[in-house]
Design a protein with these regions (language model features):
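A short glycine-rich, hydrophobically flanked beta-strand micro-motif that places a catalytic Asp/Glu
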Residues: 230-232, 294-306
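Protein kinase-like catalytic core scaffold
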Residues: 190, 251, 297, 313-316
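Active-site nucleotide/adenylate-binding loops and adjacent lid/helix of ATP-dependent enzymes
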Residues: 16-19, 24-28, 128, 133-134, ...
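Short glycine-enriched loops at secondary-structure junctions
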Residues: 143-148, 249, 255-256, 302-308
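Phosphate-binding site of ATP-dependent enzymes
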Residues: 201-288
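Conserved N-proximal alpha/beta basic substrate-recognition cap immediately N-terminal to
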Residues: 31-167
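Short glycine-rich anion-binding loops that position phosphate/pyrophosphate groups of nucleotides
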Residues: 113-115, 195-197, 320
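C-terminal active-site "lid" helix and adjoining low-complexity regulatory extension at the edge
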Residues: 4, 8-14, 276, 290, ...
Length: 375
């Protein structure tokens, strides 16, 4: 009888873990050129939902397994604004109380991992890989971040999965503009963009062969290893940002193109408004998110001429979508951030539905290696 009661208690405990509150770790980086505004928003909403949440910054963060095999993460204190006061060398280094981790109840949002060796440290990527090896659910996984860190990889995946997108070719050297133009087989105006970039930065309007060649040469003069894309221009009055979570669209907004510009990014002056999607647009957004292996993504597209019948043109998928803008736009209806967090009460939405730690592929016991002073 006692054995049956214990088995039933274990069953109930397992079901509660599958459909209930979880613990949330937010790993991010507060860059002076790209402030971490979404991280504090997620912390705020998670606390309102009574979730245990820990904010950590990649700079200075380290993780370890203790003698009992328990995983912990340490971080400098992260302020309410997402900023992290870094050590100066004049005062003792202080860490937050370490956060206990377990893949059965800890969800990790790793925002701001960027591109290893280019816009972020390789160690940030490596730390995320350790967590993946141990069965943690990552929002998003390292593969998704790599897929989305390059607009060219976005295009490759779109084509592989037959997702409608503007014609795009890559310009691989400073004298490659003319050849790329011929391969694209599209008329001016065209869009020139760097493969790595966000918020509309690095996107250029090109109206002639002369300006195309001159701009490409200038870009390669500044950085000989830059990747430059040439893309057909799809005329539109607005584009759309949809937030896709575990196979569902939880919110969307329309971003009108500001007067005198061709970009619709909020950072470039667009004033977004709520926007309802058609069934076709919803289905295609979900496919686009799946193509990059994303669990929570921001999907950007230009609507088709007939939104009910014509597939939209997908521009890119973002693996760390900013939520401040869409939260503000939809706040009278609901909180997008809260809806995202609520989705993961259901453990079946977690990546591979982890049940227990996998210690067969762990990294070093302490990462990065620390000295006695913790640095």
């Amino acid at each position: 009888m006692k054995k049956r009661i214990k088995q039933f208690a274990n069953y109930v405990d397992e079901k509660e873990r599958e459909h209930g509150p979880y613990r949330l770790l937010i790993l991010s980086n507060n860059d002076i050129h790209d402030p971490n505004r979404t991280g504090p928003l997620i912390v705020e909403m998670a606390k309102k939902m009574n979730l245990e949440v820990f904010a950590a910054d990649y700079r200075g963060a380290w993780t370890e397994l203790d003698d009992k095999g328990q995983r912990w993460i340490h971080s400098f204190p992260v302020g309410d604004d997402g900023a992290v006061p870094l050590p100066t060398g004049k005062e003792p280094i202080e860490y937050e109380k370490p956060f206990k981790m377990d893949p059965t109840d800890t969800l990790i949002m790793n925002r701001g991992i960027h591109v290893p060796g280019i816009t972020g440290n390789q160690s940030w990527y490596d730390m995320s890989k350790i967590f993946e090896y141990e069965g943690y659910t990552m929002i998003n996984g390292t593969e998704c971040h790599l897929n989305c860190s390059s607009k060219w990889m976005n295009q490759i995946l779109f084509e592989r999965h037959k997702i409608n997108t503007p014609k795009t070719v890559i310009i691989s050297h400073k004298e490659g503009a003319r050849e790329a133009f011929e391969r694209l087989d599209s008329d001016f105006p065209l869009i020139l963009k760097t493969s790595n970039g966000s918020r509309g930065v690095g996107v250029i309007w090109v109206e002639s062969k002369k300006s195309l060649e001159a701009t490409v040469q200038l870009l390669y003069r500044e950085n000989e290893y830059i990747d430059v894309l040439l893309q057909e221009y799809i005329e539109t009055k607005y584009d759309v940002r949809a937030i896709v979570v575990a196979g569902d669209v939880v919110g969307s907004m329309k971003r009108p193109v500001p007067p005198g510009d061709f970009r619709s990014n909020v950072a470039q002056g667009s004033e977004p408004v709520p926007h309802d999607l058609t069934k076709l647009e919803i289905d295609e957004c979900i496919r686009a998110a799946k193509s990059v292996d994303g669990l929570v993504t921001g999907v950007d597209f230009i609507p088709g001429a007939d939104r009910e019948r014509d597939k939209p043109f997908f521009i890119e998928v973002n693996s760390t979508p900013g939520l401040i803008g869409i939260e503000e736009v939809l706040k009278k209806e609901f909180s997008v951030t809260t809806e995202i967090l609520k989705k993961f009460f259901n453990r079946t939405r977690w990546k591979d539905h982890p049940a227990k730690p996998d210690r067969t592929m762990v990294g070093p016991r302490t990462y990065p290696i620390k000295n006695k002073q913790g640095v």
